[in-house]
Amino acid sequence: MACSAEAVFAELHALSNFSFLRGASHPKELVAEAARLGYAALALTDECSLAGVVRAHAEAKTLGFKLIIGSEFRLEDGPKLVLLAMDRRGYGQLAAFITLGRRAAEKGEYRLLRGQLETHPLDQCIAIWLPEDAPDDETGAWLARLFPARCWIGVELFLSGGDGLRLSVLQALGERLGLPLVACNDVHMHARERQPLQDTLTAIRLGRPLAELGYALFPNGERHLRPIEFLARIYPRALLEESLRIAERCRFSLDELRYEYPAELVPDGYTAIAWLRELTRQGMAERWPEGAPDKVRRQVEHELELIGAMAYEPFFLTVHDVVRFARSRGILCQGRGSAANSAVCYCLGITEVDPARLDLLFERFISRERNEPPDIDVDFEHERREEVIQYIYRKYGRHRAALAASLITYRVRSAVRDVARALGFSPSRIDTLARVLDRHGVAETLPERLAEAGLASENPAVRRLLALMQMLVGFPRHLSQHVGGFVIAAEDLSHWVPVENAAMPERTVIQWDKDDLESLGLLKVDVLSLGMLTAIRKALAYVGEGRGRPFTLADVPPEDPAVYEMLQRADSIGVFQVESRAQMSMLPRLRPQSYYDLVIQIAIVRPGPIQGDMVHPYLTRRAGLEPVSYPSPAVEKVLKRTLGVPIFQEQVMQLAMVAAGFTPGEADRLRRAMAAWHRKGGLEPFEKKLMDGMRERGYEERFARQIYRQIRGFGEYGFPESHSASFALLAYVSAWLKCHHPAAFACALLNSQPMGFYGPSQLIQDARRHGVEVRPIDVNHSDWDCTLEPTEIPNPLSLWERVGVRALQTGSNPALRLGLRLVNGFSSAAAQRLSDARRQGPFQSIQDLATRVPLDRRELEALAAADALHGLGGHRHRAFWEAAGVEAPTPLYAEPQFAEAEPLLRKPGEAEDVIADYAAAGASLRRHPLSLLRERLDRRGFRTAEALWQVRNGAIARVAGLVVCRQRPMTANGTTFVTIEDETGQINLIVWPATAQAQRRALLRAHLLAVSGTVQQEEGVLHLVAGRLEDIGKWLDGLVVKSRDFQ
């Protein structure tokens, strides 16, 4: 875009908050303010970064304003300068130069030298030299040679008292060197009001309190976008007009980026679309050996035609190649999300949702009208995803492949902590502040939280803290790596977007996140991780070894009634997607009986259907308590599978098309507006089109209003049917394993931690409730992983030799041996050394163990603390004493030379052992901690989880239990859901906001919680609405139980 004819100034040096902890304004704010002030253009020049340019570009396009792309640099052995891209080639040179500096340094840093500026091609970039107070001619002459007719001296004046002298010095310098001068302003914020925040960011960056910074702070607030009239009073007009000449030469826009996908996956003799068609044909033959249904063939042909027209075939070939590699290595993977709407993806083996089984909507995935790249999310086993990532790096090279960034922003807790430190609050006060703010702390409740920390909100220092914190929340803190979004290019990626090192070794990331990529319409491959895939693969292997033959996903029988009966009882701990408190509450009400019921089960326990008032109508119709009717056959076709209630995003899109006349592209825009309206609004234009379209087609006003109300309820929380269908497949397989092979399933879950909703303690308790014999950690039996052992030991040798899963033919109900991975402070490497030594024979004593296995004292004491030495040293106290006293052999003395008399050590009591088990291993096979307190609890009128079912609805009851998890869904209006556990089962608590507010400390901190509340029992679901909460952790002093909170 050309510069405005009326404007007389373009700002060429502006930093946003993507110059982390320097800039004090969002890119959008800078662009909007520059446009408001009448600037001709704005150059966003974050330090060695293009991380904020996409956001600035989007705002500039909206406002019809010119944005210049550039970056500020401080050469390690040279000057400070700004580089501006003149055209597409210059942009590529700039991005590559940023990459050069970032790849040479640790994450978050960069390193550039004068020599690199000389050798790196930058012939399509403009340089603005920003001299220090005493500029030297040599540097200027050097830059003038490097950038002939493209180098300026930047003059920056801030009313600091020496402006006149500085201007004259730089004018003389320019005359000597023949370099023109241009006005710049080193902008750090869009408005003066951000100066206090900019000072605070400086303190955070330097790690020192504001009061100690002195000259490290800017002397005044002049580094903001200032009115042109004001600039005309402090700069010679020629310097302002020079900025326009530079701006005119910078004609690049991010709209010029044209992304090209790798082409090497196409063999000779084929075009990309021909090869994709051939792979699809091969996959179709494998999926349907007897021939694909006509419906599927038509759908595949439609998809291939559209994929070819949109030139997306290289993207599909790349994802197919990644999936093919994973499967060749035995890594479980499965596509999900909107890609599961694609029959081509199913044929290619990317997704597992059979298009012949479900009526899916391809337009949810790819739309000609939308003309945006498709999004294919593929989940891989979380323990083996790195193999897939490194394969991508090897195949395409680090110069062509990198992960997308993830932008880490300030939240309330982190903002308060950093601001408080900058303001000089004491460490203890800062820790108190952080404790009283939970993860979902919101600014509106901060005064109350501060009062709880002993800080009055009317205190001036506290008011300052609050004001700065509220400005800082939402600011970018740093770039991290996306969970798995890969960007792969046909050529060098660094000419397209800067690439930098990630914190994790062997990883590189680009400087844009997924929203930036989507905004520019650029493709990424999502290589995601899923713990349940790891657990399923391990469980299938255990089952297969027990049966003496491989057992795969294809061997899991479909639609097993026993599986659905188990789920109807809400017996779903560990089962994928249906193990949460909310899902367990829904299972007895929905009573799934088929795969598609599971699809609905997963989707209906979501904020969208709940807020759209779709849950109750569906359940009453499913139970036969309410008739199902449809206003037309077209609507019936869309809603029949969900009994007339729209539950999925695809149904909303289909309704808009069949009932209101939307095109597929318009329906997809409606979906996107739904996803954003809570944050941005934007549904209103669709309301009129929906209402008018339905009226024109003869639908009643009441029906039209009901549909629109449900669409609003969906908001950003509507669940795609394709996504739910993908997850339902894994939910069924995990439920089948739990139902028929509980030992293998529990073993796999424990060996895949951390994952899922429950920790090891709850998984072990659940396995025992399902009849699994769980055996303790023991150095003579345990490996690193938990293992399966036969329940009938065939010979004495097996007492010490791990028989593992290969020996399970001797018993159909294997026992679960806990592994050394549960021992706090014990490493997998130490476990491997122990297992290797044990192959020579069982350990006879703790001294024998210490002699044969190179373990340090800390590792031995960790084993003793976890009671893993009970077979060698007797009870825990004695084993710990022996572990602390062992002597490692030396070259001179092969055996200990002195025997110390054994003291009389008291055997620990049962409660002491239980507490020690939890502390050292996070679980116990002894009596449940609550059973130790049961007599005391009974005297005080506490009921067990089992007895609570006998209490009538609406009655008051008292219960107590270990806290398993705490949840506060975003759409629950502040309600907290807590699950506690006693020796008979689990109890689900509902804590209303007022109760949570009044009793926050007990709610958020207690490991052992006593609750008095009202019983709520309906349709086979039981809750206790909490009235009073009490932390009774002192009843078992020292017991620490790790709960899974606010996941």
From Swiss-Prot:
InterPro entries: DNA_pol3_alpha_NTPase_dom, DNA_pol3_alpha_thumb_dom, DNA_pol3_finger, DnaE2, DnaE2/DnaE/PolC, DNAPol_HHH, NA-bd_OB_tRNA, PHP_dom
Location(s), subcellular: Cytoplasm
Short name of one Pfam family: tRNA_anti-codon
CDD domains xrefs: DnaE_OBF, PHP_PolIIIA_DnaE2
UniProt keyword DNA damage, yes or no: yes
GO biological process: DNA repair; DNA replication
EC code(s) of this entry: 2.7.7.7
Keywords, comma-separated and alphabetical: Cytoplasm, DNA damage, DNA repair, DNA replication, DNA-directed DNA polymerase, Nucleotidyltransferase, Transferase
Disulfide bonds: none
Protein's name according to its UniProt entry: Error-prone DNA polymerase
Source organism: Methylococcus capsulatus (strain ATCC 33009 / NCIMB 11132 / Bath)
Gene: dnaE2
